[in-house]
Amino acid sequence: MENTIVVKLGGVASDNLTEDFFQQIIQWQAANKKIVLVHGGGHYITKMMKSLAIPVETKNGLRVTNKATLEVTKMVLIGQVQPAITTAFQKRNISVIGLNAGDTGLLEADFLNDANLGFVGKITKVKTDLIEQLLSENIITVIAPLGINSEYDWLNVNADTAACEVASALQAEALYLLTDVPGVKKGSEIIGEIATDEIEKLQNAGVIKGGMIPKLASAAFAAENGVGKVIITDSLNTSGTKIKNKVAIG
């Protein structure tokens, strides 16, 4: 969708909601850009689980999600994080609406192929009609990373993956994956640009590690599936690392 920008807010979403962030949003809207936000909430989910004495377990960077964890995840994402984000926009008189998988089956999903993860899924389809209708009315759309499968099970979805699926489905002109670092680092230097076919080499060399591995895998998917540009950064106002769908030279 021409002029559409998708932004994935970091795990501590409130850290991204600075005045510089909102000024960039306002500038984009003045330039007739349509904006979709996909938010995570891992920090808040973990905090709530600990307060309820529910064990926190992860596997390969994904939260193991049993029934209790799923209910906490839904409660925090839909009842705490998303309203905080939409309220911040409303305070600045910016039209916004929060959506989740329960709204017209917005994000269809299926279980990941790992029973040990529990109610963790992958997006199989993004119903873009509702999003496009809201964007046509210049309403910023805020989406929680939850999916529903054909049996109407709710599934926890990695927020980076969800953002990349949404951006690809909309054929967005740009996707910004906001995180807690200013880009992909090699030593102390930010790598300005990475081709999708360089990622495995950088991972094998130990340059890409930890949580950056699944983030780059998601970014590569978006770059290879029609998103105009994909940027990993900590701010909309910094250049970060651009992920490009091209063959690396050398």
From Swiss-Prot:
A GO CC term assigned to this protein in UniProt: cytoplasm
Binding site for substrate: G41, G42, R63, N156
Pathway: Amino-acid biosynthesis; L-arginine biosynthesis; N(2)-acetyl-L-ornithine from L-glutamate: step 2/4
Enzyme Commission numbers on file: 2.7.2.8
CDD domains per the UniProt record, alphabetical: AAK_NAGK-like
Entry-linked Pfam families: AA_kinase
GO biological process, one term: arginine biosynthetic process via ornithine
Top-level taxon of the source organism: Bacteria
Cited InterPro entries: AceGlu_kinase-like_sf, AcgluKinase_fam, ArgB, Asp/Glu/Uridylate_kinase
Entry keyword Cytoplasm: yes
Reaction(s) the record says it catalyses: N-acetyl-L-glutamate + ATP = N-acetyl-L-glutamyl 5-phosphate + ADP
Any one GO molecular-function label of the UniProt entry: ATP binding
Keywords, ordered alphabetically: Amino-acid biosynthesis, Arginine biosynthesis, ATP-binding, Cytoplasm, Kinase, Nucleotide-binding, Transferase
Subcellular location: Cytoplasm
Site keyed Transition state stabilizer: positions: K8, K215
EC top class, as a word: transferase
Residues annotated as transmembrane: none
Record family assignment: Belongs to the acetylglutamate kinase family. ArgB subfamily.
Function, as annotated: Catalyzes the ATP-dependent phosphorylation of N-acetyl-L-glutamate.
HAMAP family per UniProt: ArgB
Name by which UniProt lists this protein: Acetylglutamate kinase
Organism lineage: Bacteria, Bacillati, Bacillota, Bacilli, Bacillales
